[in-house]
Amino acid sequence: MPMTMSQAFIGNFLGNSPKWYKIAILSFLIINPILFFYVSPFVAGWVLVLEFIFTLAMALKCYPLQPGGLLAIEAVAIGMTSASQVLHEIEANLEVLLLLVFMVAGIYFMKQLLLFVFTKMITKVRSKILVSLLFCLASAFLSAFLDALTVIAVIITVAVGFYSIYHKVASGKDFSADHDHTSEGKNDDGENQLNEDELESFRGFLRNLLMHAGVGTALGGVCTMVGEPQNLIIAAQANWQFGEFAIRMSPVTVPVLFAGILTCFIVEKFRWFGYGAQLPDAVHKILCDYAAYEDARRTNKDKMKLVIQAFVGVWLIAGLALHLASVGLIGLSVIILTTAFNGITDEHALGKAFEEALPFTALLAVFFAVVAVIIDQQLFGPVIQWALNHEGNTQLVIFYIANGLLSMVSDNVFVGTVYINEVKAALINGQITRDQFDLLAVAINTGTNLPSVATPNGQAAFLFLLTSALAPLIRLSYGRMVWMALPYTIVLSIVGVMAIQSGFLEQMTQYFYDSHAILHHSVKEALAPAAAH
């Protein structure tokens, strides 16, 4: 029976998403104007925010750009906000968009160096606990200066490479042969060529390393203003530079970093939560043989490329630390330097670098449309007012927990943007002092970054890992990710709360003021970024 036009419409709408999801989005689009015009703009605004959070939470059913974008377009069309307000939000956060476009693409051209480093870690270090700590620390360090998505992308590339090499050799082929590593490894007679126990141990080993690395990106990403996109938004609103941001965050981020490393050690040592899987000796030998094979094939031209990438890496860290240019422009310089000196001049080769970041950049622009609705309809006014009625450290803890809970189910860039905008409005209205605003900015930043490791919804790097081609190969499901992240979620969240509740954050911030490591800011300075647009 031929498909009717209505069936064709539903079939095309949002592609391969489940039918119930398509109906839900269409229902949202019908309900929102009715609520806005006939019930209350405030209620309609909150419903829109919840619908948008729903699209983020269901990211595995459908990438949020399309459903979230439809909701945002309708919101502008019916008057919940204006196109000019959306543009204003995008203008105010232009640096974040440049970070995503240029920095992620720039690091793409440094992948060879990062692959080289992580490969050496696995092949040269035999202790599972030590290699886990190295992966966690290396990811944390890299994520403090690079985009977490890129760091995870590199580690995924390493893991896929190792998995395919093992699969190839275990299937009776040599390193240079073509092979489908996604196959079940059976021969022509249907017999299994692969040792099942060996393969399962190897999968477990890769799962462990990827989860440690994923949490490492959160541990490092929270420390600096370029570690995560929302950090840059918060830094811009507070008018902080790279060094000041790191210093202000340190009373929370340094204890959390040590707690995270200790957690990594403990779960590996006692083999809790699915950790402690060992790399079988036979697999280790295959990987070492392959690394030696690759080293022998590496020409002077290849070695020179690694040297260039290392020099560009030094420039990247120095440029960010000394704030020699805006983050996006430093990213652009990384693209130019690596491609120019490594001979990548083909337009198509350049284009591949931008594929990873642009969908998320477009999604971020949709975030800002929803933020514009929140501002115009004053949705968070009552919530913020309630939180601001509390005093001192309790107020900071409320903001930390509120950000943390929302970041577990929604994207932390969205959550961080909403809260810092609301707190800044409270500062401009004279409800809080500038020093309290700075402390709240720390609570918001750490709140969005740390508890969000709980689920793949909160951390873009985790979602990227879950939706990668590697996840099914190593049997990494949504539920398994949540379970393996649980010890980190509990420890990082509690240590973060304790650092704030105990007064340690406030005391250390005062110490930094007294020692002139940081200076007091004025309300006027906070207005500067907004006034510039």
Curated annotation (Swiss-Prot):
Cellular compartments annotated: Cell inner membrane
- Give the domain of life: Bacteria
Which residues are listed as membrane-spanning?
10-30, 67-87, 98-118, 131-165, 209-229, 247-267, 310-330, 355-375, 396-416, 454-474, 481-501
Q: Which GO terms describe its molecular function?
A: sodium:proton antiporter activity
What is any one of the record's Gene Ontology cellular component terms? plasma membrane
Q: Which Pfam families match?
A: NhaB
Membrane protein topology class = Multi-pass membrane protein
Q: Where is the signal peptide?
A: none
Asked whether the UniProt record includes Membrane among its keywords, one would answer: yes
Report keywords, A-Z.
Antiport, Cell inner membrane, Cell membrane, Ion transport, Membrane, Sodium, Sodium transport, Transmembrane, Transmembrane helix, Transport
**InterPro entries named among the record's database cross-references:** Na+/H+_antiporter_NhaB
**Recorded catalytic activity of this chain's protein:** 2 Na(+)(in) + 3 H(+)(out) = 2 Na(+)(out) + 3 H(+)(in)
Relate the protein's function as given in its record.
Answer: Na(+)/H(+) antiporter that extrudes sodium in exchange for external protons.
The UniProt similarity line reads: Belongs to the NhaB Na(+)/H(+) (TC 2.A.34) antiporter family.
Name of the protein in question: Na(+)/H(+) antiporter NhaB
Organism in which the protein naturally occurs? Shewanella sp. (strain ANA-3)
